[in-house]
From Swiss-Prot:
The chain crosses the membrane at residues 19-39, 50-70, 78-98. Its main location: membrane. One of its GO terms (cellular component) is membrane. It is found in: Membrane. Coiled coil: none annotated. This is Putative uncharacterized membrane protein YOL079W. It comes from Saccharomyces cerevisiae (strain ATCC 204508 / S288c). Almost completely overlaps REX4. Keywords: Membrane, Transmembrane, Transmembrane helix. Disulfide bonds: none annotated. It is a multi-pass membrane protein. Residues 1-18, 71-77 are cytoplasmic. Residues 40-49, 99-132 are extracellular.
Length: 132
């Protein structure tokens, strides 16, 4: 339950500071991807995933401020922002997928050595699966 607090706080901040609809939509997509893949009852988001999320949101908001004066047509602004939003969302999804495959957080169950062995086993299984 405590992990939902930063997300709700981030959403409130986005609603407050965002004046552009595409920026808010793109940020909301990234937050939803974060909520779906990074939060459940058994795992917590890793610092890498959370950092990627914050960087993506910052880039979306900054892009909307920088690009708006330079684009003459409103449609071009939407296309550029939508393209970057899709790319950032896909990047975030890949990082979450990478976290889920290789770096699961198993609190208090495994020692560091056992965790390293499991990491190697998972990597070998993944490579075998991809090759065959």
């Amino acid at each position: 339950m405590a992990m939902y607090f930063p997300i709700s706080l981030l959403l409130l901040l986005l609603i407050r500071v965002s004046s552009e609809i595409p920026t808010f939509t793109g940020s909301l997509i990234v937050v939803l991807v974060f909520a779906l893949f990074g939060l459940n009852s058994n795992t917590f988001p890793s610092s890498l995933s959370f950092s990627c999320l914050l960087i993506s949101l910052f880039m979306l908001y900054t892009m909307s401020i920088i690009l708006l004066p330079f684009l003459r047509f409103r449609g071009a602004y939407w296309v550029v922002l939508l393209t970057f939003t899709v790319l950032l969302t896909f990047l975030t999804f890949l990082i979450f997928l990478f976290d889920c495959l290789f770096f699961p957080l198993e609190v208090g169950l495994l020692s560091e050595a056992n965790s390293a062995c499991q990491f190697e086993e998972r990597a070998i299984k993944t490579v075998r699966y991809l090759l065959y």
